[in-house]
């Protein structure tokens, strides 16, 4: 009997030891967190969005799907619909709820469209376990982070916490740089168009404001020019009206997805090619193979709210990442925006690596992100000001030549 008691005691000790070891192992098992992208995967932006997701996948592979002590899982959300062929308000609203409901998700890379961000950000801001962070590679509307339209940006942050960040600069700088460049090309009169959406109206307004400051003659009425209807079959009547005013340039504020191809075709058909009457667009027309394939796009000027890939440093992470992407996918990234998606994800991973893995702590760590230029996929350091904006105000000017975006110059707006 005594012998059996000893056996039982020994068994108990072993069981307790195994329990302690098992508990310790369970506590030290790596935690998996989810990061996501929220992009339009259908319609005109599909190629660019696919390229952005590919950049992120490659970046995650290079860091072995780790951020500090955490394993990282990547989830892709689609904020577009097949019916609309672009981002959709209702889909953006649904995605916002899905981000919050996904218990392992701690941060969102996106969105591409500023209007979609204005729907999602307030929902993430009010997440009881957050706020949840969103870092955009492409939103350029100023109102997300600074005073622009009435109530902006306060209405996007009901809790008072700024959970939104972006790695590209804003349209107040883009519009100013575009107008300055237009003047340098001898433009004295301009007709401004916008796509009637958040982004298009914002950049058209910024261009118009700067053009007026530069004493250019703005022939269009209103602070953001004239809106075009994306559902129109053609725009010949619009350009026939404009032709009578004899403008030196047409400035098109908007995105290519909204029937931009037809707009460009009819501009050239009625007003002549882009040497006769100049044409300029913002970054909502960059990165679209269908736009570059148009004969009517030749000679069009473009602006981009950051550095074009051509302007990335020829050393460091920016250079090596371009080589790695080409090797992995057999072609270069579709757009600079795609690579800035990688920069946005680098910021997110840095914050996660220094956090305790909760949404709230990832948010708190975002404020101190500081990735040196040599380690950045875009070749400039990744840092944010108090509003959540990048500290850089670089605008790249490009021209379409032989179906390719060709870099002309960089303008740094003060």
Identify the residue ranges that each predicted region occupies.
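Periplasmic-binding protein-like
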Residues: 37, 99-113, 131-137, 191-194, ...
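Beta-alpha junction/loop-to-helix N-cap segments that form part of ligand/metal-binding clefts
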Residues: 30, 47-52, 62-153, 167, ...
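Extracellular/periplasmic Venus flytrap/periplasmic-binding protein
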Residues: 85, 103, 151-270, 311-316, ...
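Extracytoplasmic "Venus flytrap"
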Residues: 36-55, 63, 67, 77-87, ...
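Short, low-complexity disordered leader/linker segments with a strong preference
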Residues: 1-34, 65-68, 412-414
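Segments of small-molecule ligand-sensing domains
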Residues: 324-338, 349-407
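Solvent-exposed loop/turn segments at secondary-structure junctions
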Residues: 41-44, 79-83, 113-118, 139-144, ...
